[in-house]
Amino acid sequence: MSLAARDDTIAAIATAVAAGAGSVAIVRISGPQAEAIGRQLFQPAGKQSWESHRVLYGHVNDPANGDVVDEVLLLLMRAPRSFTRETVVEFHGHGGLVAVQRLLELVLAAGARRALPGEFSQRAFLNGRLDLTRAEAISELVSARSRRAAELAMAGLDGGLQQRIEALRDQLLDQLCELEARVDFEEDLPSLDGAAVCTALRDVQQALDQLVLDGQQAQLLRDGLRVAIIGRPNVGKSSLLNALSGHERAIVTDLPGTTRDLLDYDLVLQGVPITLLDTAGIRSTADRVEQLGIERSRAAFASADAVVLLYDLSRGWSPDDSALRNEVPDGTPLLVVGNKSDLAAEPATTQGLAISARSGLGLAELSSALLKLCGLSGEGQGLLLALNQRQCDLAAAASAALGRSQQAARDGLPWDFWTIDLREAIRALGEITGAEITEAVLDRVFSRFCIGK
């Protein structure tokens, strides 16, 4: 898609399209022909006038045969008072799949083009309605898996992140102006305090480093954690999954090897989205089906974000438990947990936390310990603004460039050497907000949006 604003008209279904997913479906149209297409398809009831930002009631008719396609509400928003700053028409019809698909087909036949993923938001960006951080926040709000992740997305949508990045970029621009003035007119200007310039650059660098750290924590709040529960047979892995989820998700029996395949369950622990993986008990077995389950279990905990190694407190820690712990890949956060504390008398050998999946004893401590192990405090309460991965990469690149600029100062190099990396830092921050952006980057950002946004 070109960086120039488009002059064609686009359309898409803006709501879930799965059958039965909702009672209302919306077809959104944006562009210079939006109102004309609406007038061609929509027959208002009575003598309602076509006023901007007023809701009209009526029917959509097929121009080919006059058949009524759906009973709808129509919302007209004339440019520039719309999300895209183009004229926008929305048909609000009945949910399901058939009627809304037919309505979209009629809109496309009337002259609109099927919108690409994120194209409505891209037009809002290109037309100056919002900067790139706000546009990305829309996508993050839609995909938020927890309340805290949604709150962080709203902070970005409100412009907090844009203001913070622009303030840091302005500080760097001020320093660049001072340095470039000395390069061109040093004899005509008072001497520049190089130490003060370095201090200003270091302050911005430290602020960027903190934003990157916060962004990494927020990424876990957005994407969640995949946590594998592993252990020998009959240590209570399925019971723990059921206890944490609050549902009888997994079958629990006294027979070893009951769980033969991976079970997963999505939940939120202290505001953090978690996917729990209940794995087959690891042991030697001649049962081919159980062997396949064990192989899948090993693959699951090898790729998990964190591993909970569960053992039976009533039996104590064993060499088999030690062998299983050694299978966990280096660098994977590992939490050792002893289950069945309600049955344990004083076992000779213990490790890690003590819980009872049956009674619930210690589960809150387990949740907190797991999040702490992964570098998260409950719900990321200290976070006010959060960069996504693209923004983190750019902020880190800007920080590294500022480090090189300060090194040039320490090496006693002339002013113009300082400015090389300073310009790179300014460019990277501009790419975060969209002040400096390429067409390829823009396409990559908006391609991750859902269609209709």
Curated annotation (Swiss-Prot):
It is found in: Cytoplasm. The keyword GTP-binding applies. Mg(2+) binds at residues 238, 259. InterPro entries: G_TrmE (IPR031168), GTP-bd (IPR006073), GTP-bd_TrmE_N (IPR018948), GTPase_MnmE (IPR004520), MnmE_dom2 (IPR027368), MnmE_helical (IPR025867), P-loop_NTPase (IPR027417), Small_GTP-bd (IPR005225). PROSITE patterns: G_TRME. One of its GO terms (cellular component) is cytosol. GTP binds at residues 234-239, 253-259, 278-281, 356-358. Its cofactor is K(+). Binds 1 potassium ion per subunit. (6S)-5-formyl-5,6,7,8-tetrahydrofolate binds at residues 28, 90, 129, 453. It holds the Pfam family TrmE_N. Its EC number is 3.6.-.-. This is tRNA modification GTPase MnmE. Keywords: Cytoplasm, GTP-binding, Hydrolase, Magnesium, Metal-binding, Nucleotide-binding, Potassium, tRNA processing. K(+) binds at residues 234, 253, 255, 258. Belongs to the TRAFAC class TrmE-Era-EngA-EngB-Septin-like GTPase superfamily. TrmE GTPase family. GO terms for biological process: tRNA methylation; tRNA wobble uridine modification. Gene3D superfamilies: P-loop containing nucleotide triphosphate hydrolases, Probable tRNA modification gtpase trme, domain 1, tRNA modification GTPase MnmE domain 2. NCBIfam families: mnmE_trmE_thdF, small_GTP. Exhibits a very high intrinsic GTPase hydrolysis rate. Involved in the addition of a carboxymethylaminomethyl (cmnm) group at the wobble position (U34) of certain tRNAs, forming tRNA-cmnm(5)s(2)U34. Residues 224-375 form the TrmE-type G domain. Homodimer. Heterotetramer of two MnmE and two MnmG subunits. CDD domains: trmE, TrmE_N. GO terms for molecular function: GTP binding; GTPase activity; metal ion binding.
